[in-house]
């Protein structure tokens, strides 16, 4: 039995108070799968507790954010309706509380008794902001605060499970922030899009457009198959056998996922598809080099132009515009000094970590997707479409960078400073061995990179930043760490003689485009970053000038 919380009324405030006690029997909680819909039309017998149906093109959605009390299910919102109807309430309308009792009971016998205290009042002149909003409060074991104003509605919910923050914008330019506090895990989700689960008629709020994420994922799968066909026509499938087999895996698994009869088949198919798309990295990297050699593009590489561009852009800072030459000639941080050896080891380790960040995040998303499917908790099952969408969007942000880079490599093949400056021009006097480990890794990379012409733009830089920034939208801590690793990788590519500075510059727009393509970011996000940077730099210069003027 919940305990009512005492509340003191502020003076000169018109307020109405009432208490609502709600007892839920054990029978209504014992079998969630037996709950049926009794909506406003009088229809019954439709099961809304079944797991959501997953599909590449069906956009099936689970029945979450749905109120149920004593076996009676509230009418579900249509796809055109906003996720929470309270945002459109005016002061004369009574707010509606939607309570979900599908969670575990606090009592040992399974029964739950909850006490609500609801405070409805208009702000008076004694409150400073004068927005004249309607405030609704209720206290219970799962307590919360909901605020409805003309511009913004904010809801805070306290529970014992997870922590999440959700922002929902409706068609009336009102924003709904839903923050859930408690438990050991933290996540941030913005639910902006509604869609109807065609398998049971229920509604889910997606953080991103399901139509967009499904379309971009399908386009990426088609691009992989198209590259395989074009490469096969240019040099034959035998020369690119690994990439050809991977493209077949992508094609078959995509077809199976599109026509999957149930979630289990879909998950097996989408897992195979995710693995296949992950394998496009090494397979099409080698295939692109084979196509450059097979078409004779290796006879006209662009290393001379890239080297001259570095001299123009960075010649004022480094000799011949190369960080690697500056390090090679330095007596303090040179390859033979202790600092130089330590730097070489750290940066070489950072460089090879590029190969794991994307795969680890892909495995993490697949793990959560399968965990939701295998869970017996209906609330966990209802998160399957969210993790499915995250998988598609992350793969689009991650893998699309490679195919843009591969396309540019075919047009502007280059062998990298390690080969052109080091072996053709002989401008490096020392080798980068570090304490031994770096030299071992470099020898393996040199052997694996024979026949490679992928210097411009830097795929390492483009992909690393795409992984870090997209991962931040899924798992912020992982995204932060992988973004730091991306910065180290960017430095390592030039320090370790793998890329020119212009390779770094060309990789940045590729990263931005792929993040936009994946859907985690919008053009306004990048615009805000540039605007904030501009004003920050402007403020710094203004402060410096003001100090000089004061003197």
From Swiss-Prot:
It holds the Pfam family PAP2_3. Residues 153-171 have a biased composition (Low complexity). It is found in: Membrane. The keyword Transmembrane helix applies. Residues 26-50, 123-172 are annotated as: Disordered. Residues 26-47, 137-152 have a biased composition (Polar residues). Its main location: membrane. Keywords: Membrane, Transmembrane, Transmembrane helix. GO terms for molecular function: inositol phosphoceramide synthase activity. GO terms for biological process: sphingolipid biosynthetic process. It is a multi-pass membrane protein. It comes from the Eukaryota. InterPro entries: Aur1/Ipt1, IPC_Synthase-Related, P_Acid_Pase_2/haloperoxi_sf. One of its GO terms (cellular component) is Golgi apparatus. The chain crosses the membrane at residues 211-231, 232-252, 273-293, 346-366, 393-413, 474-494, 500-520. Belongs to the PA-phosphatase related phosphoesterase family. This is PA-phosphatase related-family protein DDB_G0268928.
